[in-house]
């Protein structure tokens, strides 16, 4: 499964790790498919660290109105550029904000749920070109989620909150 994040600087293509972290990927895919991320800005950009987006307020303080638990997998590490992870305010506070790294960031392991990776160097070049306040135009999801009743119920509950 892939996510194609179309920005004003180009498209970032990412592999999503549904098999390892199905809840985190399902949350992201649901928000993307609803258009939640469309026209949001990259509100936090730190050279030689990461780019962050997903805040509906554009300040880093907003989210979808719900939180969910961290989801870590032993095989997923912040050991290279282009790692896609959830931003959070501490354990169990994942929502809609995410970041993509410029470099390896091992101190983030087991603190931020990794759920994807840029596909190639061209995608990383787009990541590296993003500046503060650049925008996501839209996110396209390529592929289908495996059906999981427990996760489907969580998505249904989240959508009730999002539909308010």
What role is predicted for each listed range?
Residues 1-164:
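Cyclophilin-like peptidyl-prolyl cis-trans isomerases
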